[in-house]
Amino acid sequence: MSELQLIITTHGRKDKQLTLESLIGSGLMQRTTLVCPQKEYGYLRSLRDDYNVVAQPDPNWYLPEKRDWVVKEWVRRGHDKIVLLDDDLRFSTRISKDDWHLRPITGKELAAEFQRLEDKLGPEFPHVGFAQRQGNNTIEEVGWKTPGKQVCMMAYYLPIVAKEVDWGLVVCRGDMCATLQLLLKGYPNAVLTETCHDQREFDAPGGCSRYRTVEMLNSEAEKFVNLFPGYASIAKKEYNKKTSKSDKKDSAIRLELIVQWQKALEEGTRVRKDKQ
């Protein structure tokens, strides 16, 4: 097997490469690639010479289209393990087994955690990742959780994922959609809860915010539920959205997804066994 490749998908955040900053000093830069629109290639290429930059064929792609291309392109390049990363991530880990508080993790210490992902990733667990920071302090015993929710960063074993995931089903929450597709086909994932990630700011300028609206998110949530009846449902959440005036906010209702990951894996395992 080839070494795990780190792929950061980025758009409109040339000066705010938070994920990349966490990797400085990790020894992983040679295996890291930024995938960006052609107009951002020159600037991102000029920042450092120890990572790779690739211009995406279509500058107008939405994130699922870019992820689909990355999966196929890295298969073509002969790789079998990748981790897809959003460009605005920070990483944390438990202070100790007895102290549930989190501390930042970067560089070589973060590299050791990526090695744990690489070691876990393979035919038995073709999709793995770090847990979300939100709610981490409610987990009493940390370690590998199967199944679990994966968003913003997903490590994939390409011989399986490239064949089994359809990235064209939804525009928003494509990471959750990919996880659910794989579980329903009997492929378990593993989420490391000891180390976690979070976004510095939801809907920050650049990235998906250039096309994603509350209306689109809500429409896509309903589409998701219709695609996976019995495994996904909707909960309404009120939050404040920014208006054209930076000092003023409007209240909006966003439809959040509730996904039954365990039920999906149990059904997928049964179906997969029946086919064998």
Spell out what each predicted region is:
Residues 5-27, 40-46:
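Short, well-formed alpha-helical segments that are part of the catalytic scaffolds
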Residues 92-176, 184:
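Conserved catalytic core of nucleotide-sugar-dependent glycosyltransferases
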Residues 34, 81-86, 126-131, 189-193, ...:
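A structural signal for short, well-ordered beta-strand segments and their strand-loop junctions
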Residues 2-5, 24-34, 50-52:
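Short loop->beta transition adjacent to catalytic acidic/histidine clusters or analogous donor-positioning motifs
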Residues 35-85, 90-105:
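Active-site-proximal specificity loops/subdomain of glycosyltransferases
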Residues 2-4, 14-15, 170-172, 176-276:
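C-terminal catalytic/acceptor-binding lobe
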Residues 8, 30-38, 128:
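Short, hydrophobic beta-strand segments that form beta-sheet elements in well-ordered domains
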Residues 13, 88-90, 133-136, 196-198:
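Short, solvent-exposed loop/turn segments at secondary-structure junctions
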